[in-house]
Amino acid sequence: MTPTTETMVGIGGAAESTDMVLNIGPQHPSTHGVLRLRLVLDGERIQHAEPVIGYMHRGAEKLFEARDYRQIIMLANRHDWLSAFSNELGVVLAVERMLGMEVPERAVWTRTLLAELNRVLNHLMFLGSYPLELGGITPIFYAFTEREELQHVMEEISGGRMHYMFNRVGGLKEDLPAGWATRARACVAALRSRLDVYDDLVLGNEIFRGRTRGVGVLTPEAVHAYGVSGPIARGSGVDFDLRRDEPYLAYGELQDTLKVVTRQEGDCLARFECLLEQTHNALDLADACLDRLAELPPGPINQRLPKVLKAPEGHTYAWTENPLGINGYYLVSKGEKTPYRLKLRSASFNNIQALTELLPGTLVADMVAILGSLFFVVGDIDK
């Protein structure tokens, strides 16, 4: 019997190339917190993307149920640590609506002023960190210099650099310190004079434009499907801003100053341009609020409250145009001193869902550019 020769073909030579699963995170330089992305790759192309969230979940909504209406303000400003004042504001607006409470005019204008200054602080962080994620280290030094100056102004009035705890049900903790308005106006003017550096240093940089123009295009249909809001939605041509379309605080009287910035391209560059122009407009709104406060006569800054504050039985919904998008607060009360339920609708949670639409078909090298252009805070996603 003559021996036969057999030829074996290895599976690697006969089969088609298989997709590779790549985990980005949970700890990664391009995320503000701990976010994990599970990517399925075909070569250098992303075939499928799945954001894996929950690493910073602390059960904020459940904790609200064990705190009274004064204490929940302390919890509300922590999930998005870059928009602390705006988060406090949404909660107190919901409680005040439940109580049918009128807030003094001086408190309304001061809240509007501080909300816009907080918006500038938030945007400066991303205006500096986004170019850093694409390899440009210089802008973040400018951004943090401006933030430090503005943080001193916010710290002087509230005592806190990040978690202000300045809102109260019925108004604010206290009136503006003597001379604070003058210092705030000087800070706003200085910031405005130096914001042009981003036009020259960032938007004028051909490498930055090459990395962002036409990359990560989000369609208006996807914006509506995923509930995306804020500068990300407006960068895709969705012309909606609660401050104009459903005014709260003093925004109804600021319609001549308020400018809703939109772009039609829907790419990373459009989102960055919206953020930058929105920062300019927030400084204009802050100036308008300072002018109005200077005209107001001295008066109360808050309402007198009972020792034990109880909301009547019922439910209400309040929403605000936070720096990162729309935040909603659904409050259910059983007539007790603690909320029966307080549901948070955070902007970052909805915005990050769009990654499943944005990433497939793009290069791995563009992943960080797209991820950073969504301007999210992981604590705001996980709560």
Curated annotation (Swiss-Prot):
Membrane topology: Peripheral membrane protein
Keyword Translocase: yes
Classification via Pfam families: Complex1_49kDa
Catalyzed reaction equations: a quinone + NADH + 5 H(+)(in) = a quinol + NAD(+) + 4 H(+)(out)
GO molecular function, one term: NAD binding
Keyword NAD assigned: yes
Keywords: Cell membrane, Membrane, NAD, Quinone, Translocase, Transport
Location in or out of the cell: Cell membrane
Enzyme class: translocase
PROSITE patterns: COMPLEX1_49K (PS00535)
Ranges annotated as spanning the membrane: none
SUPFAM superfamilies registered for this protein in UniProt: HydB/Nqo4-like
GO cellular component, one term: plasma membrane
Enzyme Commission number, as recorded: 7.1.1.-
Function description: NDH-1 shuttles electrons from NADH, via FMN and iron-sulfur (Fe-S) centers, to quinones in the respiratory chain. The immediate electron acceptor for the enzyme in this species is believed to be a menaquinone. Couples the redox reaction to proton translocation (for every two electrons transferred, four hydrogen ions are translocated across the cytoplasmic membrane), and thus conserves the redox energy in a proton gradient.
Sequence similarity: Belongs to the complex I 49 kDa subunit family.
Oligomeric form and interacting partners: NDH-1 is composed of 14 different subunits. Subunits NuoB, C, D, E, F, and G constitute the peripheral sector of the complex.
Annotated protein name in UniProt: NADH-quinone oxidoreductase subunit D 2
Species whose genome carries this gene: Streptomyces avermitilis (strain ATCC 31267 / DSM 46492 / JCM 5070 / NBRC 14893 / NCIMB 12804 / NRRL 8165 / MA-4680)
